[in-house]
């Protein structure tokens, strides 16, 4: 397994295919994955397992029974960023370099409802958006996660991942 400074947090994910695809992305970029219950599926859902391919034994995945449990069981020195279309910060404006020594947690809401208003208010200064063309309402959850992970890898000179594939 690996140790990572970046954490992807899915708040009550609803679509198994998205979660499976996010497992693959987290594995590819060596990111930790946190799932906050309740889910809209079972973890053994065949659609999720298929979308995760052969990454299930490689991903660092943590389950949390609630938001409160997540806060209690993760390190106190963490930066929590919420992904939302109304965010004022873009991923490139966040210092994601691993020498920052701070654990980064990027929280993604439900596919149909987003994040609860209470969280949006609590973290109003830590909201991130992926810039997209205005007529488009949103992009797929797993694509949004991939955008954040790519920026993380870019800021860290891709961790020599490209050289490992040559």
From Swiss-Prot:
It is found in: Cytoplasm. Its EC number is 2.1.1.207. It catalyses: cytidine(34) in tRNA + S-adenosyl-L-methionine = 2'-O-methylcytidine(34) in tRNA + S-adenosyl-L-homocysteine + H(+); 5-carboxymethylaminomethyluridine(34) in tRNA(Leu) + S-adenosyl-L-methionine = 5-carboxymethylaminomethyl-2'-O-methyluridine(34) in tRNA(Leu) + S-adenosyl-L-homocysteine + H(+). This is Putative tRNA (cytidine(34)-2'-O)-methyltransferase. GO terms for cellular component: cytoplasm. NCBIfam families: tRNA_yibK_trmL. Belongs to the class IV-like SAM-binding methyltransferase superfamily. RNA methyltransferase TrmH family. TrmL subfamily. S-adenosyl-L-methionine binds at residues 83, 109, 130, 138. Keywords: Cytoplasm, Methyltransferase, S-adenosyl-L-methionine, Transferase, tRNA processing. Gene3D superfamilies: 3.40.1280.10. Pfam families: SpoU_methylase (PF00588). Its main location: cytoplasm. Could methylate the ribose at the nucleotide 34 wobble position in tRNA. The lineage of its organism: Bacteria, Bacillati, Mycoplasmatota, Mycoplasmoidales, Mycoplasmoidaceae. GO terms for biological process: wobble position ribose methylation. It comes from the Bacteria. GO terms for molecular function: RNA binding; tRNA (5-carboxymethylaminomethyluridine(34)-2'-O)-methyltransferase activity; tRNA (cytidine(34)-2'-O)-methyltransferase activity. PANTHER family: TRNA (CYTIDINE(34)-2'-O)-METHYLTRANSFERASE (PTHR42971:SF1). It is an enzyme of class 2 (transferase).
């Amino acid at each position: 397994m690996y140790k990572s400074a970046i954490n992807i947090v899915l708040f009550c994910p609803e679509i198994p295919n998205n979660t499976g695809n996010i497992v693959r992305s987290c594995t590819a970029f060596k990111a930790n994955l946190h799932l906050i219950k309740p889910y809209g599926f079972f973890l053994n859902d065949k659609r999720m397992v298929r979308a995760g391919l052969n990454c299930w034994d490689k991903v660092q995945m943590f389950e949390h029974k609630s938001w409160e449990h997540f806060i209690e069981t993760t390190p106190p020195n963490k930066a929590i960023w919420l992904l939302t279309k109304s965010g004022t910060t873009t991923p490139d404006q966040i210092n994601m370099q691993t020498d920052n020594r701070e654990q980064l947690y990027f929280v993604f809401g439900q596919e149909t409802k987003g994040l609860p208003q209470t969280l949006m208010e609590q973290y109003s200064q830590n909201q991130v958006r992926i810039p997209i063309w205005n007529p488009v309402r949103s992009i797929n959850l797993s694509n949004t996660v991939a955008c954040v992970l790519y920026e993380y890898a870019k800021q860290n000179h891709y961790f020599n991942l490209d050289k490992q594939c040559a």
